[in-house]
Amino acid sequence: MNRLLQQSVSRGPLAVRASSTITTKPPTPNQITKNNAQFDKVTHTGQAWDQSDYRLQRFDISKKSVNPNVAMHLIDQRPPEDCGDKRVVFCDGGHPALGHPKVYINLDKPGVHACGYCGNRFYNSHATKAEDMKIQHLNC
């Protein structure tokens, strides 16, 4: 009995401390309009919820961690690789131990061709002129 009493007394202050960290109550969904909506950080999938969304309650206790270095932004910073006059190139992702299969990419059409697995971009300098660099192809 004494042990049960000690456990219940020790749990009381912890519950008070945890609940005292919540300072303000978010607005209800019917109070949110397009003009006053405040969105949380956008994730790599493009998800962002307004402040009244019930899915944000998991971040009341801990902070939401979002990596700003999204892979598609990092790959976009790499310039396309000039493959000279080659009509077909392959992309293996750089190292076979990374799990990237060998993907063959046809470069006959003018424009930049991206690997569907990793996003690396290639172009044929013979078929692609400067004005054609805006054309994007995705090869899966």
Curated annotation (Swiss-Prot):
This is Probable NADH dehydrogenase [ubiquinone] iron-sulfur protein 6, mitochondrial. It is a peripheral membrane protein. Gene3D superfamilies: q5lls5 like domains. Keywords: Electron transport, Membrane, Mitochondrion, Mitochondrion inner membrane, Respiratory chain, Transit peptide, Transport. It is found in: Mitochondrion inner membrane. Belongs to the complex I NDUFS6 subunit family. Pfam families: zf-CHCC. Complex I is composed of 45 different subunits. This is a component of the iron-sulfur (IP) fragment of the enzyme. GO terms for cellular component: mitochondrial inner membrane; mitochondrion; respiratory chain complex I. PANTHER family: NADH DEHYDROGENASE [UBIQUINONE] IRON-SULFUR PROTEIN 6, MITOCHONDRIAL, NADH-UBIQUINONE OXIDOREDUCTASE 13 KD-A SUBUNIT. Accessory subunit of the mitochondrial membrane respiratory chain NADH dehydrogenase (Complex I), that is believed not to be involved in catalysis. Complex I functions in the transfer of electrons from NADH to the respiratory chain. The immediate electron acceptor for the enzyme is believed to be ubiquinone. GO terms for biological process: mitochondrial electron transport, NADH to ubiquinone; response to xenobiotic stimulus.
